[in-house]
């Protein structure tokens, strides 16, 4: 959809396949960038939030459900953390969680839409937090697909894809050619991760994405959690590696250093989230 609907009673809704997902609030910004429609809202429940092309992306009071789930299984398990690549993530939340690790020496954030970054910094500053002023962060306002294609072999220890749904500028982040480039530029012992849609609202996209990543990397597994403002509230992230499912085993020292500052993630939560694969999806992937 192109823009959220706003009712007379102040509800801002996302519509998906005959179901409405809404928050009560008011629109602060609604504009069109060269890539997508960007809407910033102020809701009574989740604080300020961001929508792209009418689809909920993040909000101040529930963003940790998404960002911690994407980041920590990868960064707690990769062999090294010196160089990290984040594709998308213009709200800054993924970069913020990555930069909590002192072993990260350089983080490339590649975001195609600079207006998302500007509006997030202005209206949602708590999500990016100190990441925007961290000297280790290099913000690149470029196409993430082209960035991976042009990167040198084995140049990143962790690659995180924090993109929107597979339409518009994010469509190319879900195909085989892109995943192969990510594998090429991943260092030995590295971990790749991407958001992989809802197993309920986007069932076939989710299954196809996990299957394709597994074919490209050799090892890949979905992790399941919840993001209350997303379609169905049930979401997934898929993790991959070429040398075994290392993403399932957080390194104790890293986990101990990071978990006390987390709202959602812990080694115990992660174990359950990987094991929570529905039977019908497990059959499809076998």
From Swiss-Prot:
S-methyl-5'-thioadenosine binds at residues 36, 111, 143-144, 169. It catalyses: S-adenosyl 3-(methylsulfanyl)propylamine + putrescine = S-methyl-5'-thioadenosine + spermidine + H(+). Its EC number is 2.5.1.16. One of its GO terms (biological process) is spermidine biosynthetic process. Spermidine binds at residues 67, 91. Residues 9-242 form the PABS domain. Its main location: cytoplasm. Pathway: Amine and polyamine biosynthesis; spermidine biosynthesis; spermidine from putrescine: step 1/1. Keywords: Cytoplasm, Polyamine biosynthesis, Spermidine biosynthesis, Transferase. It is found in: Cytoplasm. It is an enzyme of class 2 (transferase). The active site is at residue 162. InterPro entries: PABS (IPR030374), PABS_CS (IPR030373), SAM-dependent_MTases_sf (IPR029063), Spermi_synthase (IPR001045), Spermidine_synt_N (IPR035246), Spermidine_synt_N_sf (IPR037163). GO terms for molecular function: spermidine synthase activity. Catalyzes the irreversible transfer of a propylamine group from the amino donor S-adenosylmethioninamine (decarboxy-AdoMet) to putrescine (1,4-diaminobutane) to yield spermidine. NCBIfam families: PRK00811.1. Belongs to the spermidine/spermine synthase family. Homodimer or homotetramer. This is Polyamine aminopropyltransferase. It comes from Prochlorococcus marinus (strain MIT 9303). The gene is speE.
